[in-house]
Every structure is written in C-alpha cells, then in structure tokens.
From Swiss-Prot:
Role of this protein: F(1)F(0) ATP synthase produces ATP from ADP in the presence of a proton or sodium gradient. F-type ATPases consist of two structural domains, F(1) containing the extramembraneous catalytic core and F(0) containing the membrane proton channel, linked together by a central stalk and a peripheral stalk. During catalysis, ATP synthesis in the catalytic domain of F(1) is coupled via a rotary mechanism of the central stalk subunits to proton translocation. Component of the F(0) channel, it forms part of the peripheral stalk, linking F(1) to F(0).
Superkingdom in the source lineage: Bacteria
Gene Ontology MF term list: proton-transporting ATP synthase activity, rotational mechanism; proton-transporting ATPase activity, rotational mechanism
Subunit structure: F-type ATPases have 2 components, F(1) - the catalytic core - and F(0) - the membrane proton channel. F(1) has five subunits: alpha(3), beta(3), gamma(1), delta(1), epsilon(1). F(0) has three main subunits: a(1), b(2) and c(10-14). The alpha and beta chains form an alternating ring which encloses part of the gamma chain. F(1) is attached to F(0) by a central stalk formed by the gamma and epsilon chains, while a peripheral stalk is formed by the delta and b chains.
Residues spanning the membrane: 2-22
HAMAP family: ATP_synth_b_bprime (MF_01398)
Bilayer disposition of the protein: Single-pass membrane protein
Gene encoding the protein: atpF
Protein's name according to its UniProt entry: ATP synthase subunit b
Origin organism lineage: Bacteria, Pseudomonadati, Bacteroidota, Flavobacteriia, Flavobacteriales
Source organism of the structure: Karelsulcia muelleri (strain GWSS)
Length: 224
C-alpha cells in the first residue's frame, strides 16, 4: 500500500515542527553535552597520556633510585669491609705489641731471676769450693807436717848421733881433737839452720800453693 499525500504532508509537517522545536530547545544543550563529553574524553585521554609519561618518569626514577641504592649498598658494604679489615689489622697490631711487651717483660724477669739464681749458685759453689779447698789444704798441711816432722825427727837423730860422737871424740882425744871437731860442730849448726830454713820454705810454698789454687777456683767460678 502506498501512503497518501495527506499522510506524507502531515508527517513532514510534524517532523519539521519537531525539528524546529528540538533545534531551538534541545539541540544546543545536547551539543553542549556532547562537546563537554568530547572535551572530557579528550582531557581524560590527555591525562592518561600524562599519567603514562608520569608513570614512565616514575619508573625511570625508580630504576635510577634502585641503581643508586645498589651502588650505595655496594659502597657501604665495601666501606664496612674496609673498616672491618682496618679494625682487624689495628687489633692484630695492638695484640702483637701487647704480646711482644709481655714476652719482653717475662724474658727480662726470667733473665733477672736466672742471674739471681746463677749468682746464688756461684756464691754457694764459691763457699763450697773454699770449704773444700780449706779441708784439702788442711789435710795436705797435716800430711806435710807429719812428713816434715818425720823428716825433722830423722834428721835430728842423725845430727844427735853425729854430735854425740863428736862429744866423745872431743873429750877422749884431747885439745887437738877439740880444735879439729869445732869445725864439725859448726857444720852441725849450719845443718840445723839449713833444716829450719827448709821447713820455713816448705810452709811458704804450701801457703802460696793454697793462694794459687784458691784464686784459680775463684776465677773459674767467675767465668761460669
């Protein structure tokens, strides 16, 4: 069915009237709303772009911060290790110095104690050697005295026998024998004097021998 001309006419009139009404009352607000919406969309897109750039910048900053923090971390760790090594070295040096000082002190104390002990031992040895040498020399002197007394008694007996013979001859044979035997008497006196001088020399020799042995032992002790 084809529409009639009247219907088309009235429909077009209604459309025009509605278009005029809409354009006059509704078109501008709709356009404004659309413009606002478009502007909002454009602004939101721009803001999104800005946000993207801002996020990129933040990411870059984050990366830089992380890099810097890594560098700082390694730097701090290295510094901490260096300080630790320095502290350990200083502590080792201090410990070495303290141990060296303690060792030196102990060595000095040991040496002093050793010297004191050696001096005591030397003095004891010296005293013992003096006592022993005195005993030995006393024994030697006693032996020498015994030998000398024996020798002296023997010689006295010989001299007495000889003088007794001279005495008998002097009074038996007269004045001639007296003059002749006076020389023998002088000989006997000389022999007696020689004997006593010999005995003195023996005592002197023993005395010097004692001194020599004593000082020799003393030198040996001082050498040790």
């Amino acid at each position: 069915m084809t529409p009639s001309l009247g219907l088309i006419f009235w429909q077009s009139v209604i459309f025009l009237i509605s278009f005029i009404i809409l354009s006059k009352f509704a078109w501008n607000p709709i356009n404004k709303l659309l413009e606002k919406r478009e502007k909002y969309i454009i602004d939101s897109i721009n803001n999104a772009e800005k946000a993207k750039e801002y996020l990129k910048n933040i990411k870059l900053k984050k990366k830089n911060i992380l890099k810097n923090t890594e560098k700082m971390k390694y730097f701090i760790i290295n510094e901490a290790f260096k300080k630790k090594e320095q502290i350990e070295k200083e502590a080792k040096k201090k410990a070495k110095l303290e141990s060296y000082l303690i060792i030196n002190k102990t060595q000095l104390l040991i040496e002093n104690k050793k010297k004191i002990a050696i001096e005591k031992i030397k003095n004891e040895i010296l005293n013992m050697s003096i006592i022993i040498s005195e005993k030995i020399l006393n024994k030697e002197l006693e032996i020498n005295e015994k030998n000398n007394n024996y020798f002296f008694n023997k010689k006295l007996l010989i001299i007495m026998k000889f003088s007794y013979k001279i005495f008998i001859k002097r009074y038996a044979k007269g004045f001639f024998f007296l003059v002749f035997n006076s020389k023998k008497e002088i000989f006997i006196k000389n022999e007696i004097e020689k004997f006593f001088s010999y005995k003195k020399e023996l005592y002197k020799k023993n005395y010097f021998k004692f001194k020599y042995t004593f000082f020799k032992k003393k030198r040996k002790d001082n050498f040790f």
